[in-house]
Amino acid sequence: MPIITLPDGSKKVFEKSVTILEIAQSIGAGLAKATIAGKVNDVLIDATLPIKNDSKVVIITSKDKEGIEIIRHSFAHLIGHAVKQIYSDIKMAIGPVIEDGFYYDIFSEQRFTPEDLIKIENRINKLIKTNYDVEILQVSKEEAIKTFKERDETFKLRIIEEIPEEGLINLYKHEEYIDMCRGPHVPNTRHLRHFKLLKLSGSYWRGNSENEALQRIYGTAWAKEKELKDYLTRIEEAEKRDHRKLGKKHSLFHIQEESPGMIFWHPNGWTIYQVLEKYIREILKKNDYLEIKTPQAVDKSLWEKSGHWEKFRDDMFTTASENRTYAIKPMNCPCHIQLFNQGLKSYKDLPIRLAEFGSCHRNEPSGALHGLMRVRNFTQDDAHIFCKEEQIQEEVSTFIDLVFEVYKTFGFDEIIIKLSTRPEKRVGSEEIWDKSEEALTKALDNKNLKWELQPGEGAFYGPKIEFSLKDCLNRVWQCGTIQVDFSMPIRLEATYVDIDNEKRNPVMLHRAILGSFERFIGILIEQYEAKFPIWLAPYQIILLSITDRNNEKCLKFNELINNNGYRSKVDIRNEKIGYKIREATISRIPLIAVIGDKEEEIDSVALRALDGTNLGIFNLPNLYKLMDELIDKKGRTE
């Protein structure tokens, strides 16, 4: 007689084993109809599995986060059901849930096309309408092998090989189609309604390019039709803002197969990069950082001492010379300690803040590379603060102010903050962990900031704070971080002399604001849709001549504007002025200055903004004044 305790504390007694669906039915028919799965003593299970013992039970519906994930996972199985009905010689690989959706990797000799995607989606819709029950079969490993051998499912058999002998394996039966999964899944396809197959792409079994090539079908699913429509609108907007498309359209950068994950910056993109670097450099100088530069290739002995060789060797690019092995640096911190170690340091010298625009290389898998967002060569706005334990709070507090100042400069006003604390496996005494976590907590609380605690998510060498931006599409980008490190200064023998004339190891704070220049510029391209605020724009103003008579004045003004430190260009082609204005607008140049006979007579320009607003007639001094005001505002929304 299991006693079931519900979330409100009420209890229900059943005479025999009971399922989640039966519990829901005992509460009400409406709840039973909405039930997707359940949580039994905090473990998700299928709605039709029996509960034999006293348990705490939560009923899961599509309103719950777990509910929508179960719906998405069930849709992945529906892809398998549909493609197996349509095509022969198909073998199913894996079909997990991902953020906002799902995918299935499939082996097929036939290459899927967009027309196939439509065909598969139509078949899924047809299957859904039959409202069939999804059965769960809990079988032994031997039975699972037999089932998938009969179906010639090579990839499923490989997965089963890795499963321990003991215990049962969950198989899910969609009419004639059988798949394998931890589950849970929906009990009936009536719960599967609002979905869309999105795209096709290539992949490899286990993500290894030496394995079989697979085809991946992506989809999304939601509890309500409106949620699906809203998501598809966001996807459409995101595609419009895709930094890879805009980067090509506006000649900002490109990537070639000969150098995967490494950026060829075009003049327009490099201008943005340089403006960004100049701004960060000014901020660092104002906050008493010392800018340094360290080598690209460093003998592996340093990486062995720092611990990176053991943990990150596979992610490093290496080279050899004169019987020595070098790693192209994947991060800057060990090199920064080498600089700190030059010369004796006193407690009076601390804190020491060393900053570098450090070019790093990491051997990311080719399948994970994504434009500017995931690259193999990137530049960090990296800095390391060497300080005493009692200085941690003040340094973190100052850095938080710096982060908010920079993000607001670019128009990011919504910042998400997370504090990650000690993991189970860690170095350092409990006392120093207590002090560090308290320092980080106080630094946040003293500023009345909202933040989220992530217990156990800190690195083994210290707690950290992460700063994430929310963009115009409500996407979250983790960029900034400040990380306490007790370990590396000890490993690499960084010391200072304290007030008692004793040698001590400093605490090292790893910190970055942008994260990497490449990724941050990618975020900015999408945030602004390449309509950069004037301070960042590759060209800030373009001068257009109405007729050939005005070309000389255009060229003269262009020279004067550039000589005054602005970025200007001209369009003196023999084209109609309307065409030139359209071209300048498409090029996303913030200010468009037209010079005709009238303007030339009064030594001025007719100025308009990128959005078409007529700003009026400006002589050069007034134009400079306006441009300075706009540049000073940068990208701030206030």
Curated annotation (Swiss-Prot):
<dbReference type="InterPro" id="IPR002320">
    <property type="entry name" value="Thr-tRNA-ligase_IIa"/>
</dbReference>
<dbReference type="Pfam" id="PF03129">
    <property type="entry name" value="HGTP_anticodon"/>
</dbReference>
<dbReference type="InterPro" id="IPR033728">
    <property type="entry name" value="ThrRS_core"/>
</dbReference>
<keyword id="KW-0694">RNA-binding</keyword>
<feature type="binding site">
    <location>
        <position position="384"/>
    </location>
    <ligand>
        <name>Zn(2+)</name>
    </ligand>
</feature>
<comment type="similarity">
    <text>Belongs to the class-II aminoacyl-tRNA synthetase family.</text>
</comment>
<dbReference type="InterPro" id="IPR045864">
    <property type="entry name" value="aa-tRNA-synth_II/BPL/LPL"/>
</dbReference>
<dbReference type="InterPro" id="IPR012676">
    <property type="entry name" value="TGS-like"/>
</dbReference>
<feature type="region of interest" description="Catalytic">
    <location>
        <begin position="242"/>
        <end position="533"/>
    </location>
</feature>
<dbReference type="Pfam" id="PF00587">
    <property type="entry name" value="tRNA-synt_2b"/>
</dbReference>
<dbReference type="InterPro" id="IPR002314">
    <property type="entry name" value="aa-tRNA-synt_IIb"/>
</dbReference>
<dbReference type="InterPro" id="IPR004095">
    <property type="entry name" value="TGS"/>
</dbReference>
<comment type="function">
    <text>Catalyzes the attachment of threonine to tRNA(Thr) in a two-step reaction: L-threonine is first activated by ATP to form Thr-AMP and then transferred to the acceptor end of tRNA(Thr). Also edits incorrectly charged L-seryl-tRNA(Thr).</text>
</comment>
<feature type="binding site">
    <location>
        <position position="510"/>
    </location>
    <ligand>
        <name>Zn(2+)</name>
    </ligand>
</feature>
<keyword id="KW-0862">Zinc</keyword>
<keyword id="KW-0820">tRNA-binding</keyword>
<dbReference type="InterPro" id="IPR012675">
    <property type="entry name" value="Beta-grasp_dom_sf"/>
</dbReference>
<keyword id="KW-0479">Metal-binding</keyword>
<dbReference type="InterPro" id="IPR006195">
    <property type="entry name" value="aa-tRNA-synth_II"/>
</dbReference>
<keyword id="KW-0436">Ligase</keyword>
<dbReference type="GO" id="GO:0005829">
    <property type="term" value="C:cytosol"/>
</dbReference>
<dbReference type="InterPro" id="IPR004154">
    <property type="entry name" value="Anticodon-bd"/>
</dbReference>
<dbReference type="GO" id="GO:0000049">
    <property type="term" value="F:tRNA binding"/>
</dbReference>
<keyword id="KW-0067">ATP-binding</keyword>
<dbReference type="InterPro" id="IPR012947">
    <property type="entry name" value="tRNA_SAD"/>
</dbReference>
<keyword id="KW-0547">Nucleotide-binding</keyword>
<dbReference type="GO" id="GO:0006435">
    <property type="term" value="P:threonyl-tRNA aminoacylation"/>
</dbReference>
<comment type="subunit">
    <text>Homodimer.</text>
</comment>
<dbReference type="GO" id="GO:0005524">
    <property type="term" value="F:ATP binding"/>
</dbReference>
<keyword id="KW-0030">Aminoacyl-tRNA synthetase</keyword>
<keyword id="KW-0963">Cytoplasm</keyword>
<dbReference type="Pfam" id="PF02824">
    <property type="entry name" value="TGS"/>
</dbReference>
<protein>
    <recommendedName>
        <fullName>Threonine--tRNA ligase</fullName>
        <ecNumber>6.1.1.3</ecNumber>
    </recommendedName>
</protein>
<dbReference type="GO" id="GO:0004829">
    <property type="term" value="F:threonine-tRNA ligase activity"/>
</dbReference>
<keyword id="KW-0648">Protein biosynthesis</keyword>
<dbReference type="InterPro" id="IPR018163">
    <property type="entry name" value="Thr/Ala-tRNA-synth_IIc_edit"/>
</dbReference>
<dbReference type="GO" id="GO:0046872">
    <property type="term" value="F:metal ion binding"/>
</dbReference>
<dbReference type="Pfam" id="PF07973">
    <property type="entry name" value="tRNA_SAD"/>
</dbReference>
<dbReference type="InterPro" id="IPR036621">
    <property type="entry name" value="Anticodon-bd_dom_sf"/>
</dbReference>
<feature type="domain" description="TGS">
    <location>
        <begin position="1"/>
        <end position="61"/>
    </location>
</feature>
<feature type="binding site">
    <location>
        <position position="333"/>
    </location>
    <ligand>
        <name>Zn(2+)</name>
    </ligand>
</feature>
